[in-house]
């Protein structure tokens, strides 16, 4: 995989001004973004998140998932901490793409869970890859991470490229009546580390 750094700009947000670093995968043409806030240290653990693109949750405020809630909470946590990063990866629908995600939602409307829907369409439950994160983290100067995630695959991906995950920070937000079954499936079938104790509900 060939990841090329492109440019950096300011990104004003409700939580403060982030820096937005653009990257291009020259093999696939996909574009990825790293958001950074404050001064990042290569020696100290940095609060961060790997976030896969979710148009429906991040931009369209869908309650079918917890993605948008996680993104906003991660940005808020980073701003309150004073520094941190988010790697925003263009892997819509756990890697199956937007239109296939809508097809999967149609199957879920008929009773399939999120894993079954992907498999009925001929896809694995999770197609995401994380090999692009190494050059992105190298560019922003991060070697030790306090990782905001419930997904053990992301912790493993960090460790495999030599990034020390000093702490896994649970990010359980946004549970509501529309996504309760989805969250349960992520826990029971995809191995996400979640507990009722950590959940923040949304009405």
From Swiss-Prot:
GO terms for cellular component: cytosol. Its cofactor is Zn(2+). The active site is at 126 (proton acceptor), 128 (nucleophile). GTP binds at residues 49-53, 70, 92-94, 114, 149, 154. The keyword Acyltransferase does not apply. Keywords: GTP-binding, Hydrolase, Metal-binding, Nucleotide-binding, Riboflavin biosynthesis, Zinc. Gene3D superfamilies: GTP cyclohydrolase II. SUPFAM superfamilies: RibA-like. One of its GO terms (molecular function) is GTP cyclohydrolase II activity. Its EC number is 3.5.4.25. It catalyses: GTP + 4 H2O = 2,5-diamino-6-hydroxy-4-(5-phosphoribosylamino)-pyrimidine + formate + 2 phosphate + 3 H(+). The keyword GTP-binding applies. InterPro entries: GTP_cyclohydro_II (IPR032677), RibA (IPR000926), RibA-like_sf (IPR036144). Pathway: Cofactor biosynthesis; riboflavin biosynthesis; 5-amino-6-(D-ribitylamino)uracil from GTP: step 1/4. It holds the Pfam family GTP_cyclohydro2. Catalyzes the conversion of GTP to 2,5-diamino-6-ribosylamino-4(3H)-pyrimidinone 5'-phosphate (DARP), formate and pyrophosphate. Belongs to the GTP cyclohydrolase II family. This is GTP cyclohydrolase-2. It comes from Shewanella oneidensis (strain ATCC 700550 / JCM 31522 / CIP 106686 / LMG 19005 / NCIMB 14063 / MR-1).
């Amino acid at each position: 995989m060939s990841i090329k750094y492109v440019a950096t700009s300011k990104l004003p947000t409700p939580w403060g001004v982030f820096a937005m670093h653009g990257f291009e995968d020259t093999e696939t043409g996909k574009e990825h973004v790293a958001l950074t806030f404050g001064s990042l240290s290569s020696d100290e653990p940095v609060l961060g998140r790997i976030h896969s693109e979710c148009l429906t949750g991040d931009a369209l405020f869908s309650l079918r998932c917890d993605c948008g809630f996680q993104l906003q909470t991660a940005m808020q946590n980073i701003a309150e901490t004073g520094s941190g990063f988010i790697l925003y990866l263009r892997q819509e629908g756990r890697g199956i793409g937007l239109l296939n995600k809508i097809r999967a939602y149609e199957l879920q409307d008929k009773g399939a869970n999120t894993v079954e829907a992907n498999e009925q369409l001929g896809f694995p439950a999770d197609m995401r890859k994380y090999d692009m994160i190494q050059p992105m983290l190298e560019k922003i100067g991060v070697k030790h991470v306090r990782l905001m995630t419930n997904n053990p695959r992301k912790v493993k991906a960090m460790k495999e490229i030599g990034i020390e995950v000093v702490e896994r920070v649970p990010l359980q937000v946004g549970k509501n009546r529309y996504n309760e079954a989805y969250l349960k499936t992520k826990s029971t079938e995809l191995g996400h580390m979640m507990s009722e104790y950590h959940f923040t509900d949304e009405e």
